[in-house]
């Protein structure tokens, strides 16, 4: 089925960002169902989306349903299949924060800068402003640490093995800043734009820098870090703003 993805995309008038999203979602779908498309495999695929947000589920189901219709039109499939993409969002007075499946953040992408920005927030809890000020000299990739200096002092942060390859690729450039614009940092808006484009490309347009930072907090809490330890990692004066995450 993977062989039909590119002809399908060519049959549609899609912006580059949307095309990247469609391609990613369809490859993921084909890898999961293989050559067997039937009610059982589609039900298993739909079940695999249970950990995603409502917006992400609807996007993926819509993309796959369009692909299934295309395969039927091309007589690749003898029967027309369509998954129910009517998803009821659950509402509550207090939004429930849950840990997300972030495997898509590490997959191959054309949006390398946006991907690295997202991973720095997700894995280190950095803000776009902090990322803008990062210099290559702040990183010791051999020791796998980042030394982040601010008016509150120096924070030493451990770089995970999963993050390291992305930083090594970025560090190959001979420049001052990690994200360098003629030896000057880019504007905050540039960082938000890069992040937005990457998130849209993996079907997570509803996420933001703030929600990725919340994922960092939830992941650190799940790893057993205390509220004080997480506050220190984030460079906060007080852990008060983190209390809502620890009362969940």
Curated annotation (Swiss-Prot):
Compartments it resides in: Cytoplasm
Keyword Cytoplasm: yes
CDD domains to which the protein is assigned, alphabetical: INT_StrepXerD_C_like
GO BP of this protein: DNA transposition
Coiled-coil region: none
Domain Core-binding (CB): residue ranges: 1-72
Keywords for the protein's UniProt record, in alphabetical order: Cytoplasm, DNA integration, DNA recombination, DNA-binding
Positions of the Tyr recombinase domain: 92-248
Principal place of residence: cytoplasm
Active site per database record: 213, 245 (o-(3'-phospho-dna)-tyrosine intermediate)
Similarity remark: Belongs to the 'phage' integrase family. XerD-like subfamily.
Function: Putative tyrosine recombinase. Not involved in the cutting and rejoining of the recombining DNA molecules on dif(SL) site.
Record protein name field: Tyrosine recombinase XerD-like
Species name: Streptococcus equi subsp. zooepidemicus (strain MGCS10565)
Organism taxonomic ancestry: Bacteria, Bacillati, Bacillota, Bacilli, Lactobacillales
């Amino acid at each position: 089925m993977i062989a039909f993805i590119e002809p399908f995309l060519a049959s549609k008038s899609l912006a580059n960002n949307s095309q990247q999203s469609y391609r990613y979602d369809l490859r993921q779908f084909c890898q999961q169902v293989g050559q067997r498309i039937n009610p059982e495999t589609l039900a298993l695929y739909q079940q695999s989306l249970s950990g995603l947000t409502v917006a992400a589920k609807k996007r993926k189901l819509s993309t796959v349903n369009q692909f299934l219709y295309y395969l039927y039109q091309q007589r690749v499939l003898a029967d027309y299949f369509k998954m129910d993409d009517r998803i009821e969002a659950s509402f509550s007075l207090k939004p429930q924060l849950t840990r997300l499946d972030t495997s898509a953040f590490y997959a191959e992408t054309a949006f390398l800068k946006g991907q690295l920005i997202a991973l720095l927030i997700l894995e280190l809890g950095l803000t776009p402003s902090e990322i803008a000020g990062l210099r290559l000299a702040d990183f010791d990739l051999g020791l796998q640490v980042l030394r982040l200096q601010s008016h509150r002092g120096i924070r030493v942060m451990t770089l995970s093995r999963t993050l390291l390859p992305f930083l090594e690729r970025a560090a190959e450039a001979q420049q001052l800043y990690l994200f360098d614009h003629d030896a000057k940092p880019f504007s905050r808006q540039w960082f938000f734009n890069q992040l937005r484009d990457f998130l849209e490309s993996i079907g997570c347009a509803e996420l933001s820098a703030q929600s990725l930072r919340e994922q960092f907090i939830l992941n650190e809490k799940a790893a057993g870090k205390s509220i004080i330890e997480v506050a220190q990692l984030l460079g906060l004066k007080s852990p008060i703003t983190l209390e809502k995450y620890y009362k969940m």
